Amino acid sequence: MRLPPRDHLRGAVALINSRSEQLNSPYSKVLTHAVQNEVVSLDVCQTLETSLTLMSQIRTSIILGHPMVPTPKVWPLSAPTSQTAGEQLVMATSGLLNLRLEWEALSSKSPQYTTEGEILQLLSKAQDLDTRLVTWSHTVPSNWKPIPAAIIPQSVRAAGLFDGRCDCYTDVWVATTWNYYRDSRIVIQNIILSCLHMLPNHNTTATAASSTITIKSLATDICACVPFVLGSQMESVQMNPYKVEYPEAEGRRVTHAHQQTAPLVGGFFLLGYMESLCTSSFGCLKDEQIGWVKGQMQRILQIYTFGMRVVGR
């Protein structure tokens, strides 16, 4: 398969951004889905970092209704890390789009035309895909695994911790990869729950409870990533990114690369996943957690819109 050049994909993202008044039109949605598919294909053969950048541009622009910040010609890169784990994750999630399409097709049918066999088949596919993602999480290198923060500056605490949780990562790209994993699993678990709710004659209580617990855990892990990515940042610090304080874990000191990269693109990568928590958690999250997430989303909008009021927020 011939892959599109990166410039073509960036051009497609720019086109989506330029159609702010039509972002929710059928044509824009088709274009968005097409670009996302090409991004996944590009990533399998190239790098996860490029794909996450492009995907976040798409997701965040849709949330805001307009391009959030001008796209830099060159993205600042953090310290080199192995791309193997990221590439393996993309391969593991390659069936997610088809799974979602199958679920949408099944759920759009009238109940009288939906067979138990179809539901069970989709449920099995979702569970198999989820197992592949869990396997990925157990095989990542040790330096990719999040570590609870040992030092959390008061300014970071004041900016927001959920349930006292704060995890540190090698860099913002690794953190974003983990959030992609979590978001993907939440989507899968939602499909599993939906299938279970369509099987009233089966004893699915234990499985449904397990999915609910999993969604809560994954959502809390995303929340625990926020302090590492945003630090104490409450406003744009383009002129002096080093004024932002960050948490540290044992053996993971704050790097210059993180201080340079996180203020520019950190919230950019978080916003789409946090929006998903508010809209796709299947009622599994408490109001307190949803409220915290919305507060942090508003904080991100404050940072990247230079304090301007965002319509509809």
What function would you assign to each model-found segment?
Residues 2-200, 204-232:
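Central/C-terminal regulatory/activation regions of fungal transcription factors
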Residues 40, 72, 135, 168, ...:
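Intrinsically disordered, low-complexity regulatory regions with latent secondary structure
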Residues 65, 238, 304-307:
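Glycine-centered flexibility motif
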Residues 97, 113, 162, 228, ...:
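Phenylalanine-focused residue identity feature
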Residues 152-171, 238-260:
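Carbohydrate-binding/catalytic loop surfaces
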Residues 185, 272-275:
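C-terminal region detector
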Residues 232-240, 312:
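Short glycine-rich, low-complexity/disordered patches
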